Every structure is written in structure tokens, then in C-alpha cells.
Amino acid sequence: MIGLTVRQMQYFEALAQTLHFGRAAKLAGVSQPALSSQIAEMELRLNCRLFERGGKSVRMTDEALAMLPRIERILADIREIETTARRGRPAMEGRFRLGIIPTVAPYLLPHVLPELKRHFPALQLELREAVTASLVEDTALGKLDAFIAAVPLDQPWLITEPLFSDRFFLAVPAGDPAFASPPVPPESPALERLMLLEEGHCLREQALAVCGSVRPVAMASYGATSLTTLLQMVAHGLGVTLIPEMAAGPASAMRDLKIVPFQEPMPQRTICLAWRRNKVRHDECVELAKIIRGLDQAVLAA
């Protein structure tokens, strides 16, 4: 009897998706030696080579390519088995793993969490804050049940349910004469001082799209990891930055910072809930989207 384990198949799937032992280990949430050891054990049990190692490159063998669809189906069935017990129970009960991007989490969660607790007291919510690419990967691997991010999301295996629109404003140093007469046109030369989040944050790409006709000269000098850091830099006169409306209320209370609008039509992003295109947790995700859409949008923008 071969006796493959679920863990070995999960590691195999991660390595097949990434073709890189380090990235596969990160996706699986284990150390690289642990993943390598389990892959080697899997090859020993199957009595065949699954991956060709050549320096930093990894290539799947013909045997591995033939096995991949079957292993993916097995793992998908296992994930469905793990959640089948929820069927027939009230919606949103038990463990639910939700991801959310950093430019939404601190502003949305304080409003969403009390509502979820009120409606679904048996819900065991597990939160993960990460950039969109990481949330997509975790959802693909079955490590998240759903996530909240900004569209567009181009993965055809995802269902996306729009939640709300979030307009963009500018955060500028208080007293800056370049912004004395708002609203600000997107082509304003003053936006050359635009500061951006580091690579990987969708807000960075959205800022570049909004101010695409202006070259942000400060971009190379500053790559902040959080919106809070960017706002502190703006308050110290180092530049300006794009800020979502849901963050503008709290930011307006900062000293030496001013929030100004763009010219109409104001740019905006659409925030959505996304989950895998299957029926396992579909009803629960629809219920979650309904709760979030039911929030008072004026409260979110406050």
C-alpha cells in the first residue's frame, strides 16, 4: 500500500503551482526542509521521480504532470468534506477564514465584526491581512474561505460580489499653497510629489492609474509598507498621497494634514468579497456580503 498523506499531497500541489521550493514552503506554511523532506518521502513511496531539480529551477516530470489533476481533485474533495458538516446548520457558523487587504482592514473591520457577532454568535472568524496576490494564493490553496479586496480580480475561478464604492481623496500637508483651492485636477503638477505604497499593494496601482499623466518623482525614494506610514510622511511635508474615503475621516484628525477632493468625476475603487467558484461555502459568502452591504456607508466614510 502506497499510503500517501494529505500533507504530502498538499505540499505536492504547492510545489506544482510555484515550481520553487522556497515559495511552495511559504504557501504551505512550513519550512523549506520540511516540505523537501515530504516530497522526497512521497517520491520514495511512489517509486518515481516527481520533480527534476536543477540549481534554482524545478521541473515537473511526466509522472507528476499526470498525477496533478487527480491530486487536485482529491484535495478539493477533502476540503469539501471538511465543510460538509456545516450544511443544514444556520449560515455563518463554525470556522470561517477571511482575508482582507491592509488598506481596508483597519477601517472596515471595526464596523463589520460587531455586526457578525450580533448576527452569528457561533461564528469562529479567523482573519488574515495581506496584499491581494497573497490572498488570491491562499484562497487557491484552500487556506482562506473568502477575502475582501479591490477589483479587478482576473482569476476566472473566483466569484466576486461588489460590496461598496470607495472614493479617492488626496492627503496633503496642511497649509501647502499648491492645494489652497481644491478640488484638484488629476493632471495637477503638484501630484509629482505623489508618494506610493511599496510594490504589491493594489492602492499603489490605483494611485498610478488616477494620476497616470503625472510622473511621481517621489516614488523611487519612498515605498511605505502601510497607509499610516505614508500619512505620517505627508504630515511632515515629504509629499502627498492618495487616500481612500474610508480612511479619510480618521486621517483628517491628524495634525499638519489636510484632506482635499479631486475634481469631478472623483476617482474611486470598488471593494468586493471574493471566493472560490464552488458550492461549499457559497451561501455563507453571500450572507457575509449582504451584512457588509447593509452597513451605513456614511459610517464607513466617517
Residue ranges and their predicted role:
Residues 13-34, 47:
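Short helix-boundary/capping micro-motifs
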Residues 43-60:
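A short LG(V/I)-centered, amphipathic sequence patch enriched
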Residues 93-156, 224-227:
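Central regulatory/effector-binding core of bacterial HTH transcription factors
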Residues 108, 257-300:
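A late-sequence structural motif
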Residues 154-162, 166, 180-183, 188, ...:
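Beta-alpha-beta core module
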Residues 178-180, 184-185, 192-214, 281-290, ...:
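Secondary-structure junction motif
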